[in-house]
Swiss-Prot record:
Organism: Dictyostelium discoideum (Social amoeba)
Comp. bias intervals (Basic and acidic residues): 265-274
Signal peptide: none
Biased composition (Low complexity): 74-227, 275-287, 397-414, 522-559
Region described as Disordered: 1-32, 74-228, 265-287, 342-376, 394-414, 466-491, 516-559, 727-755, 778-799
SUPFAM superfamilies documented for this protein: Winged helix' DNA-binding domain (SSF46785)
InterPro entries for the chain: E2F_WHTH_DNA-bd_dom, Mucin_signaling_protection, WH-like_DNA-bd_sf, WH_DNA-bd_sf
Name of the featured protein: Putative uncharacterized protein DDB_G0282499
Key words of the record: Coiled coil
Keyword Acyltransferase: no
Lineage top rank: taxon: Eukaryota
Pfam family, one: E2F_TDP
Length: 935
């Protein structure tokens, strides 16, 4: 049964010379034109609605190629067909007929005739399967990707048909050429193969082939109303139109071709009926069953393989489409801006569809809001339309239509309820006849509606964007976690092959420095083990710059690292960590601790000098770093750059670091000879570095200076530190003897050279002590209280002074402040800021008001910073006093070497006396060892 698109089909076929396209709007004005021109015009008219001119140009080119191929095939089929019935029938009418045509095959026993017919039947079956696949997927026909899937299915099956035709016609070169020419056009459009098959079958005289034609026509009609489903409007849902335009235009072109093929098939039916009446011989009765079975097996195998691939592609695409629809349903919303006139039109359309079970498709009007505040116009997504064509709906399409009707009814009810909300007085205004007021109220309604729905849409859109961003961030985090886990697994596997080591881990809230003597105080010289727990801020730096000489052990309860530092002859200026007094076990935990000394946030805490100093020293000691860059430390520890520079300036003045310029520094350590030199020289100096007045903290120095004892000791050496930690001097001599004097643990051993003309290996030499103790003035007295020692005129002493100038700091305000504050700390008493204020200003009366004014001066504030740096390094202990002033007390702790007793016992006058005694002993030994002269 044929389901046609045009009523009175037989009258149209017999009487009308022009062929009407199912999408054509032309009637009688096309009578004088040819069929091809009419179809081409109708095809182009269905494309011109598109806003994109690029698409129309593409379609015109495609159309010209199709119809050129169509005309050539139409002519060639009359001359190259294997069935002689067609040639006998069109003998008089066909100008291309030639009895001597090489393509004409008049062999009654030719087996290829049946092969071709069988192939045509198989092609029809394949096309029927394609149409079934197309109909099965019609539920997704409104989606953009389904048309593409169906086109792929048809193209794949058409390619199978091409292969089958080529395999079946290998016996005859002429037939092979004809089949290749006929089937090469199959790839142009999806339904071109139907046309070729129908022409073959129509030229035969068998009833079975006529029935196949009817089946093909039915399938073509099914394709037409399924293609028409693409034009059903989506109730105002805003969508992208580009893909729909392309797919709809392809479907329109297919429908036009199918219509034209249908006309030709109907004409061929009549010709076949005439052939039967004239009793022409039928060559199709000579069947070759062996070839048929072989071809059938080949077709089935190819179809099975291709169908499996096609089904997999369809399933994947359908899953993607479902995901897209699920996301779009959350964002896309039916637009409510429909006027009353448009509502009535939609209601009439729904009633007409319910009564007639036909769907009349019209081009949707461009909906725009009439209010002045509306800034956007809303376009319906359906750019393509049909006019005055009635298409029968399938059951699944009827279900979709009912769902659309329900959505429209809900939309109308929502609009009616929203229009009545808050405007109950509108009827009264209508009764009064105030048209101006009505228009104003309507405008206000529309403005409020637009604002309401725009706000809702924005909320939905923002929420969807947030969800998308959250999903992306979660995916990125998951990927990063997976990568980290993989890296950790690789690292763990590599570590299992080597020694059992573990990286240091510590909570983010603790910044702690633990010195090696807390675990191994018995062996401070040979080796020292340090247990350091790192922080979160320095974990990255410690992992990247961990020393190869450190080995770590892991336990089940806590994870710590024990670093073993061995004193070797190749290392110089190695870190020698201090030995604290029994009452001080230094641990700097200052964040998220109840007893901590900082209660601010971590961000503010990292701007404080004490916190930054603790992080810096911890990083340097735990990672065994000697040379570093300030910018690199800033990025690793995430601290303030300017605070870090202030700390390093104080440490440079204290001889704890050395500046190598360009923000490069060298960490010298707490027991380096430069720091010991600096501490001894400041403690035994006889002046105040701030006021330049006479000031003595060493009793022996004060007594000897008052008695007029001249200090002539040129060289001062320290052997308490391991010799490997000292850099050797340039000059050497074989005439060196040493005498050591061992004291208690708090004191150190000193090595004195036997004469001033000899310098000692592995020692740091100092300038003349008189020069240092005079505050760097180069000798002479400054202020009252004892005469200053003069510089020795010996040349070797002068060379030692020149070599010692590298240890002399440049006198600046900060250096003088650091020197004087350190001198006060080494005086072995609890120092307060009150004492510092009046020590720096001795001429001011010691009152509370003066103390408050002096406390806010720049130098005293710098003393606060110096005290915080020394406290973080564990050189000073800070505590609050109980007095009314509530000032802070500072107690000097020092290092394992530099203590108050060490400073007192290493007075330069005492060293000078020991030096003189040693010289006298050497002279006596030399006199005794000399041989007696002969008499």
């Amino acid at each position: 049964m044929d389901i046609g698109l045009i009523t009175n089909k037989e009258d149209d076929e017999e009487n009308d010379l022009s062929i009407k396209s199912p999408y054509s709007t032309t009637k009688n004005q096309n009578n004088n034109k040819t069929k091809d021109e009419i179809i081409k015009k109708d095809f182009i008219s269905n494309i011109n609605y598109s806003n994109n001119n690029i698409y129309s140009n593409i379609y015109n080119n495609i159309f010209n190629n199709i119809f050129n191929k169509f005309n050539t095939n139409n002519n060639n089929n009359n001359t190259t067909n294997n069935n002689p019935n067609n040639n006998n029938n069109n003998n008089n009418n066909n100008p291309n007929y030639n009895n001597n045509n090489p393509n004409y095959n008049n062999n009654d026993n030719n087996p290829n005739n049946n092969n071709n017919n069988n192939n045509n039947n198989n092609n029809n079956n394949n096309n029927n399967n394609n149409n079934k696949n197309y109909i099965n997927n019609k539920n997704y026909i409104n989606n953009n990707n389904i048309n593409y899937i169906n086109n792929n299915n048809n193209n794949n099956n058409n390619n199978n048909n091409n292969n089958n035709n080529n395999n079946n016609n290998n016996n005859n070169n002429n037939n092979n050429n004809n089949n290749n020419n006929n089937t090469s056009n199959n790839t142009s459009f999806n339904k071109q193969n139907n046309y070729n098959n129908n022409n073959y079958n129509s030229n035969s005289s068998s009833r079975s082939n006529n029935s196949n034609n009817n089946n093909n026509n039915n399938n073509n009609d099914d394709n037409i109303y399924n293609n028409g489903k693409n034009y059903i409007p989506n109730n105002g849902i805003i969508n992208n139109h580009s893909n729909n335009d392309i797919n709809n235009s392809y479907n329109n072109n297919n429908n036009i071709q199918n219509y034209y093929y249908k006309k030709n098939n109907n004409e061929n039916k009549k010709k076949n009926n005439d052939n039967e009446n004239n009793n022409y011989p039928n060559f199709n009765n000579n069947n070759n069953y062996n070839n048929y079975n072989n071809n059938d097996n080949i077709i089935n195998n190819n179809n099975n393989n291709n169908n499996n691939n096609i089904n997999n592609n369809i399933n994947n695409n359908i899953n993607n489409i479902n995901n897209i629809n699920n996301n779009n349903n959350k964002i896309i919303r039916q637009h409510p801006y429909i006027n009353n006139e448009n509502q009535q039109k939609h209601q009439k359309k729904i009633q007409h569809q319910e009564n007639s079970n036909f769907e009349q498709l019209e081009k949707p009007e461009q909906l725009s809001h009439n209010s002045e505040s509306s800034k956007t116009t809303i376009l319906n997504e359906n750019n393509s339309y049909l006019k005055n064509d009635k298409i029968m709906l399938s059951p699944t399409q009827q279900q979709q239509q009912q769902q659309q009707q329900q959505q429209q009814q809900q939309q109308q009810q929502y609009l009616i309820s929203s229009s009545k909300y808050g405007y109950n007085n509108q009827n009264n205004n209508n009764n009064n006849g105030n048209s101006n007021q009505e228009s104003i109220l309507e405008k206000k309604k529309k403005i409020r509606k637009t604002r309401y729905f725009e706000n809702e849409y924005q909320k939905l859109h923002e929420s969807n964007i947030k969800n998308i961003n959250n999903n992306n961030s979660n995916n990125n985090n998951n990927n990063n976690n997976n990568n980290n886990n993989n890296n950790n697994n690789n690292i763990y596997n590599e570590e299992e092959l080597s020694l059992n080591t573990s990286s240091p881990i510590q909570s983010q809230s603790q910044y702690q420095v633990i010195y090696p003597h807390q675990q191994c105080p018995s062996s401070p010289t040979s080796s020292s083990t340090s247990t350091s727990s790192t922080t979160s801020s320095s974990s990255s730096s410690s992992s990247s710059s961990s020393s190869s000489s450190s080995s770590s052990t892991s336990s089940t309860s806590t994870i710590t690292t024990t670093t073993t530092i061995t004193t070797q002859s190749t290392f110089q200026n190695q870190i020698q960590l201090p030995q604290p007094s029994p009452y001080n076990q230094f641990t700097a935990t200052f964040i998220n601790s109840s007893n901590g000394f900082i209660k601010k946030k971590e961000k503010d805490a990292k701007k404080q000098i004490k916190v930054v100093t603790t992080l810096l020293i911890q990083h340097l000691i735990s990672n065994n770093v000697t040379k570093f860059n300030v910018r690199l430390i800033e990025s690793l520890l995430n601290v303030d750059f300017f605070k870090l520079k202030e700390i390093l300036d104080i440490m440079e003045c204290s001889k704890l670091v050395r500046n190598d310029k360009c923000n490069n520094y060298v960490w010298l350590g707490l027991d380096n000879p430069e720091f010991l030199n600096f501490a001894l020289s400041t403690f035994h100096s006889k002046i105040n570095f701030i006021t330049k007045n006479s000031e003595f903290f060493c009793d022996n120095c004060k007594l000897n200076s008052e008695n007029g004892v001249i200090l002539n000791s040129p060289i001062l050496q320290f052997s308490n530190v391991s010799p490997t930690l000292l850099s050797p001097s340039s000059s050497t001599s074989s005439e060196t003897t040493t005498s050591t004097s061992t004291t208690t643990n708090n004191t150190s051993t000193t090595t004195i050279s036997p004469s001033s003309n000899v310098s000692v290996n592995n020692s740091y030499s100092l300038v003349n002590m008189s020069d240092l103790y005079n505050g760097g003035s180069g000798g002479g007295s400054s202020g009252g209280g004892g005469s200053g020692g003069g510089v020795n005129n010996n040349n070797n002493v002068q060379n030692n002074i020149n070599s010692g100038r590298k240890f002399r700091y440049k006198e600046t305000e900060l250096s003088t402040t650091v020197s004087q504050f350190l001198k006060l700390l080494l005086s072995d008493k609890c120092l307060t800021i009150h004492d510092v204020c009046f020590n720096f200003n001795p001429n001011i009366e010691k009152t509370h008001d003066n103390y408050i004014s002096l406390r806010n001066s720049a130098k005293i504030k710098r003393c606060y910073d110096i005290a915080n740096v020394f406290e973080a390094i564990n050189l000073v202990q800070k505590s609050k006093s109980v007095e009314e002033t509530r000032t802070q007390n500072y107690k000097w702790i020092g290092t394992t070497v530099l203590t108050n007793e060490y400073c007192q016992n290493n007075c330069p006058y005492i060293l000078q006396e020991n030096y003189i005694q040693q010289q006298q002993q050497l002279q006596l030994q030399q006199q005794q060892n000399q041989p007696k002269p002969p008499r």
